[in-house]
Amino acid sequence: MLSKNQVKLIQKLQQKKYRNELNLFIVEGKKSIVEFLQAGYRLELLIATEVFATALNGQPITLVSKEELRKVSSLKNPDEGLAIFHQRQHKGILQEGVILALDNVQDPGNLGTLIRLCDWFGIETLICNSQTVDCYNPKVVQATMGSLTRVAVHYVDLAGFLATCTLPLYAMDLDGENLYTTEFPEDCVLILGNEANGISLEVRALADGIITIPRFGKLQQTESLNVAMAGAIVVSQVRKLDN
């Protein structure tokens, strides 16, 4: 059974302010919880139904009913467990390979998908400016399906980082060179912008190349692609050229 203090802690961690203050975050769902445990994240609290608890030998568990779990979960259909882990502090940014950079991406689902995308394509470093949604937002963590354990997410002064970065910088925009005729080096930074406004003028000015995904529709009336979709297309093309 959950204590009042445990309930209050879970509620607090829905807010970025308290996640940063306490250096904690929430993970929901059996698969994701197991992945964070296996990745060695330090556990603060684990609540689970009896069904899930039987698979977690050796872990300190607070047993709850499905109804109790439902009351503290942010999901419509909670999946047998909720855990609180300590945030992991990543070391310095290694400037090699393909790096993905995000300029003010706001939607948790988009960031979660982009983290999964990095994991799938072997991109280990994701750079975000401070206005990009928090990677420890519960909706982001849920959308990553455990991929957050394998991708280092860094929040930095993006313009400052790009200004001193030694790798070629390619920013995605509607007005740029054709993605499919661009030759990318093995090591580079791919920059994606805000869902509504794209990349900022400051970041655009720092880019070595501006790249666009060409439209093939006859009427050419589609305004833009979802940022996660665009990211998938771009990274896939870069990896294709690597091979």
Regions found by a protein language model. Name each.
Residues 1, 27, 62-65, 149-159:
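Short acidic-hydrophobic, aromatic-tinged amphipathic segments that line or gate anion-handling sites
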Residues 1-50, 132-133:
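Boundary-proximal intrinsically disordered activation/regulatory segments immediately upstream
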Residues 29, 106-114, 222-228:
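Amphipathic alpha-helical repeat scaffolds
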Residues 38, 92-177:
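RNA substrate-binding interface of SAM-dependent RNA methyltransferases
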Residues 56-67, 97, 168-169, 183-189, ...:
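Active-site regions of enzymes building and remodeling cell-envelope glycoconjugates
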Residues 61-86:
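Glycine/small-residue-rich loop that forms an oxyanion/phosphate-binding "nest" at active or ligand-binding sites
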Residues 120-121, 137, 142-149, 204-243:
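Structured adenosyl-cofactor binding patch, chiefly the S-adenosyl-L-methionine
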Residues 171-221:
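Active-site/ligand-binding-proximal alpha/beta "capping" segment
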